[in-house]
Amino acid sequence: MTQPSLNPLVIKLGGAALSCSQTLSQLFGAIASYQQKEQRQIVIVHGGGYLVDELMEKLQLPTVKKNGLRVTPYDQIPLIAGALAGTANKLLQGQAMADGLNAIGLSLADGGLCQVEELDPELGAVGKATPGDSSLLQTILNAGALPIISSIGLTAQGQLMNVNADQAAVAVAGALDAQLVLLSDVSGVLDGKGHLIKSLNQQEADALIAGKVITDGMIVKVQAALEAANDLGRAIEVATWRYPENLEKLFAGESIGTQFLPA
């Protein structure tokens, strides 16, 4: 098996980092510093729900969620695609360029990277992504660029689709045979004494949920991470961007958060 340090690394960027230029600058600065010394290829996948929420509020349109997924009426998908594949993607690309990186803004559709189909008619223009052809993305990586990929995709019929960013990152990682890190404001899963749990499988997570160690919104995050590990067929990591000094360790293949193990 290839050493994790040699596999490409897909970083799904979420949480408040997307709206904080200082946090983004620390992340991109760490990537630039790391890639001056090492050859590991890194890909960013992002959502941008906060931008969509702001846009919906300005347009006085309701935000409706079902099972944690944004309901996206087909007449609203051009607006949401504009916010995610347009504004959010270009803001991230601009920050990366300002921090010395050769950043390329992409979507799930570019080069056939991910195939996208409608997930559930009741959700509207919400798609499920599956791994596609990574050859164009690999060419971009081989050129030394940092791909920044929005979670907007296209169906085979050319219909715009909004894909959950975690699920999009799993599909991108699958296409690239890459390691996956979900990077957010959550450092990982803590035990009852506030110590970081280094790894979790479904059985261990169920026991912690039953014991009220994992509660509330963290339950959703844990189940989503375990589902991502199962879909990808390898361990994934949930870690935080809050400690920039740890990021280069993460890029080098060290665990700095909680590893979620597939069944």
Swiss-Prot record:
Which of this chain's residues are annotated to bind substrate? Answer: 48-49, 70, 162
Q: Where in the cell is it found?
A: Cytoplasm
| Catalytic activity as recorded in UniProt | N-acetyl-L-glutamate + ATP = N-acetyl-L-glutamyl 5-phosphate + ADP
**Chief localization:** cytoplasm
The answer on whether this UniProt entry bears the keyword Amino-acid biosynthesis reads: yes
Keywords of the record: Amino-acid biosynthesis, Arginine biosynthesis, ATP-binding, Cytoplasm, Kinase, Nucleotide-binding, Transferase
Similarity remark: Belongs to the acetylglutamate kinase family. ArgB subfamily.
Role according to the record = Catalyzes the ATP-dependent phosphorylation of N-acetyl-L-glutamate.
Listed name of the protein: Acetylglutamate kinase
Source species of the chain: Vibrio vulnificus (strain CMCP6)
Q: What is the lineage of its organism?
A: Bacteria, Pseudomonadati, Pseudomonadota, Gammaproteobacteria, Vibrionales
